[in-house]
Amino acid sequence: MTVVAPGSVVFRNICKQFGAFTAIPDLSLTIEPGTLVTLLGPSGCGKTTTLRMLAGLEHPTSGRILIGGKDVTMLPANERDVSMVFQSYALFPHMNALDNVAYGLESSGMRRKEARERAEEGLALVGLPGMGQRLPAELSGGQQQRVAVARALVLEPQVLLLDEPLSNLDARLRRRVRTEIRELQQRLGFTAVYVTHDQDEALAVSDRIIVMKDGNIAQEGPPRELYETPASAFIADFMGEANVVACDVIDVDGHEATIRVERLTHRVSGRGMRPGPAKLAVRPNAITLEPSAAGSFSGEITHTAYLGDHVEYEVKTAAGTLFVVDPAVERALAPQTNVAIAFKERGIALING
């Protein structure tokens, strides 16, 4: 089974209101064919409303939605060339896996024999060959999720929609299934729109991430760009923990800036900043600690936690309390240790407040 024509997605000035409440004020975005794009954000940010409008389960108050170049703004869900994988899987409990996967095909008028053959192909595609006769209750959570993905894929949609698809799985299974989804998307080349509030999922599966806040796009770009060069304190903290530290930009030379925190100076990407007060996002693993009472930037460890493959510290400094992650478990430092603080080359970014 192949996806012959992955579709693009375009939102043009979409507004969505529920009574007097405006969930999406003015949203414009473009998703290229054959890419997996994640809508990421906290609860209430508008990501699920956006997905539901794309699926045809909600209609915008104003604006246009195009799929594969076709205006589908007011089309009902059953007339859109999309398939959706729900958070709850939405499998029929009285049907076996094969019948669940074949259901959409038969409902669209395909002959039963052909539908079941394609359903068997779909189950094999997601790694469940020979399991078609099992009821959902006889499958693990991960297997049920794969049945739901197979059911969506056999319809050969232009766009596959995934709404929090891993939220009902335990942590270890989530890692495995997200890898399977990403490998499947890359192998078949279909367009996918993936909704989650989990930044690890978004980083692991996406070609691009759209971070939403209050119904607007806070930042979008490739995963690495959003993680390493967040545009704001909100993005820095939402894309993984970050220390937000006050600093001074003391010099700008081309695309680079020299910043100062206390008496520590460091070179970072200038990002169009001018000399003066600024904010710095510092990843916990971009900080190094050395036992020392002296240094250009010093502090005192107030808390130490050993977590097997790394040690976490809280360090009290004149610039505020820093959260630090250090892989050097063999030399864990005790609370009340005075330390000199330095920054690594990567994981430091100037941000807008």
From Swiss-Prot:
It is found in: Cell inner membrane. One of its GO terms (molecular function) is ATP binding. The lineage of its organism: Bacteria, Pseudomonadati, Pseudomonadota, Alphaproteobacteria, Hyphomicrobiales. One of its GO terms (cellular component) is ATP-binding cassette (ABC) transporter complex. This is Fe(3+) ions import ATP-binding protein FbpC 1. It comes from the Bacteria. Its main location: membrane. Disulfide bonds: none annotated. Its EC number is 7.2.2.7. It catalyses: Fe(3+)(out) + ATP + H2O = Fe(3+)(in) + ADP + phosphate + H(+). Belongs to the ABC transporter superfamily. Fe(3+) ion importer (TC 3.A.1.10) family. The gene is fbpC1. Keywords: ATP-binding, Cell inner membrane, Cell membrane, Ion transport, Iron, Iron transport, Membrane, Nucleotide-binding, Plasmid, Translocase, Transport. ATP binds at residues 41-48. The complex is composed of two ATP-binding proteins (FbpC), two transmembrane proteins (FbpB) and a solute-binding protein (FbpA). It is a peripheral membrane protein. SMART domains: AAA. It is an enzyme of class 7 (translocase). It comes from Rhizobium meliloti (strain 1021) (Ensifer meliloti). PANTHER family: SPERMIDINE/PUTRESCINE IMPORT ATP-BINDING PROTEIN POTA, SPERMIDINE_PUTRESCINE IMPORT ATP-BINDING PROTEIN POTA.
